[in-house]
Curated annotation (Swiss-Prot):
Top enzyme category: transferase
Name of this protein: Bifunctional protein HldE
Highest rank taxon of the organism: Bacteria
Catalytic activity: D-glycero-beta-D-manno-heptose 7-phosphate + ATP = D-glycero-beta-D-manno-heptose 1,7-bisphosphate + ADP + H(+); D-glycero-beta-D-manno-heptose 1-phosphate + ATP + H(+) = ADP-D-glycero-beta-D-manno-heptose + diphosphate
Pathway(s) the chain acts in: Nucleotide-sugar biosynthesis; ADP-L-glycero-beta-D-manno-heptose biosynthesis; ADP-L-glycero-beta-D-manno-heptose from D-glycero-beta-D-manno-heptose 7-phosphate: step 1/4; Nucleotide-sugar biosynthesis; ADP-L-glycero-beta-D-manno-heptose biosynthesis; ADP-L-glycero-beta-D-manno-heptose from D-glycero-beta-D-manno-heptose 7-phosphate: step 3/4
Coiled coil: none
Residue sites binding ATP per the record: 195-198
Job description of the protein: Catalyzes the ADP transfer from ATP to D-glycero-beta-D-manno-heptose 1-phosphate, yielding ADP-D-glycero-beta-D-manno-heptose.
Primary gene name: hldE
Length: 476
């Protein structure tokens, strides 16, 4: 599957659910307590991170999406800490403060990157508190494309059926990270994302792949879901929809340090991708890759757009180097620019690669970090050079160029000039060899208009493909 990122900045998402503060006490341990057989930890670091629905919102914001967050909190210092935590990433929360309840807090004690104990400070919110929260959130539906219901069974999401129905009636997709054994509470949702344990808590033990699909489709029909995405740890994810074959997505995590917040990452990446216009299979692949990144971090964490681009490149091969398609190159170029790399581009027929070409390409590469070589295809070379050319077919010409240390990407084009492909890719620097004037170089005007530069480089005298061909023919 080809996977590329949509325009996350266009995504408008509302997150409603159980917000909490994840607090970490961290320090070394080197002895056992004389009072009980437990380690003694000397705390030297305290860190607060937004968790639950708040972590979902922060993941969306980190990816570049526009997000609103609604949840239940107490009137305490923890609520203030949680507010500061989400505001730090530009999220303005819509809290409903409940005077007689504490803000949910999960305190973890860590030593040597291992969690020793977790202490929970919480009381479930009342049904009327949930009703007030959902009613308050209805006013936000007109300004978003996707809603995420992040349910941790702490009371914020009690009976959301009316809220789901209203959102769907307004054309807003509703994604649910479910909890508990009663999925009827989410009737009519666009997509639910249970993990395997949550799925089996509702449908019973899954005995085979066929059994999983049968039970998932049963839930689709029973509760009028559009889709179910079952997250399956080391087995990846399985997407089941009513009108398409199932989609199995293998896991991409290389190392797993901590699964805390992985479900939040999945649903946030799904929501942001769908709100930005991605199709569901593509959104699932993006979410799967994001989860693979976050489980490699310790504690509740987010995934940045750059981290996601790099992970997609690694696991889906869409921005590898060498001979690439134009679409693959556009994606690779986006990644390179996000890394702050200066991209140089040149073009030519390169029919018989010679020392002059090699010297020229070395000069071009020295002007930046990455070098693109656009190559005329065979029909284009024939139109430009006449009968008998090219001597080498385009796939062979590109393979030789791709083998040069100076060249990062080689891409073909079919027109007589590379103006169109240059205008699409817009490198930082466009170079051309010979005695051209800058204003006469194809694509130069577009590069300059976009803030780039155009430069003419010299060729070595006396070396050309035409001269080589004439010399060979003269010796025959």
């Amino acid at each position: 599957m080809k996977v590329s990122l949509p325009a996350f900045e266009k995504a408008k998402v509302l997150v409603v659910g159980d917000v909490m503060l994840d607090r970490y006490w961290v320090g070394p341990t080197g002895r056992i307590s004389p009072e009980a057989p437990v380690p003694v930890v000397k705390i030297n670091q305290v860190e607060d991170r937004p968790g639950g629905a708040a972590n979902v919102a922060l993941n969306i914001a980190t990816l570049g999406g526009q997000v609103q967050l609604a949840g239940l909190v107490g009137e305490d210092d923890t609520a203030k800490a949680l507010t500061l935590g989400v505001q730090a990433l530009g999220v303005e929360p819509q809290w409903l403060n409940i005077a007689d309840k504490p803000t949910i807090t999960k305190l973890r004690v860590l030593s040597r990157n291992q969690q020793l104990i977790r202490l929970d400070f919480e009381e479930s919110f009342d049904k009327q508190d949930s009703a007030r929260l959902l009613k308050q959130s209805e006013a936000l539906l007109d300004s978003v494309d996707v809603v995420v219901l992040s349910d941790y069974a702490k009371g914020a999401i009690d009976k959301p059926q009316d809220f789901i129905a209203l959102a769907r009636a307004k054309g807003v997709k509703v994604l649910v990270d479910p909890k508990g054994s009663d999925f009827s509470r989410y009737h009519g949702a666009s997509l639910i994302t249970p993990n395997m344990s949550e799925f089996e808590a509702v449908v019973g033990a899954v005995t085979s792949e066929a059994d999983l699909l049968e039970k998932a489709r049963g839930l689709l029909n029973k509760h009028q879901f559009d889709a179910i995405l079952v997250t399956r740890s080391e087995k990846g994810m399985t997407l089941v929809t009513a009108n398409a074959p199932e989609l199995h997505i293998p896991t991409v995590a290389r190392e797993v340090y901590d699964v805390t917040g992985a479900g939040d990452t999945v649903i946030s990446a799904l929501a942001t991708s769908l709100a930005a216009g991605a199709e569901l299979p593509q959104a699932c692949a993006i979410a799967n890759t994001a989860a693979g990144v976050v489980v490699g971090k310790l504690g509740t964490s987010t995934v940045s757009r750059i981290e996601l681009i790099e992970a997609l490149a690694l696991h889906h091969g869409e921005s590898g180097f060498g001979v690439v398609s134009e679409d693959q190159l556009a994606y690779a170029l986006e990644q390179a620019k996000l890394r702050g790399e200066r991209v140089v581009m040149t073009n030519g027929c390169f029919d018989i690669l010679h020392a002059g070409h090699v010297s020229y390409l070395k000069q071009a590469k020295a002007l930046g970090d990455r070098l693109i070589v656009a190559v005329n295809d065979d029909a284009s070379v024939k139109r430009l050079k006449g009968e008998g050319r090219p001597v080498n077919q385009v796939d062979r010409r590109m393979a030789v160029l791709a083998g040069l240390a100076a060249v990062d990407w080689v891409v073909p084009f079919s027109e007589d000039t590379p103006q169109r492909i240059i205008a699409r890719l817009l490198p930082d620097l466009l170079v051309k060899g010979g005695d051209y004037k800058v204003e006469d170089i194809a694509g130069g005007a577009e590069v300059i208009a976009a803030g780039g530069q155009v430069q003419v480089l010299g060729f070595e005298d006396g070396i050309s493909t035409t001269a080589i061909i004439q010399n060979i023919m003269a010796k025959q």
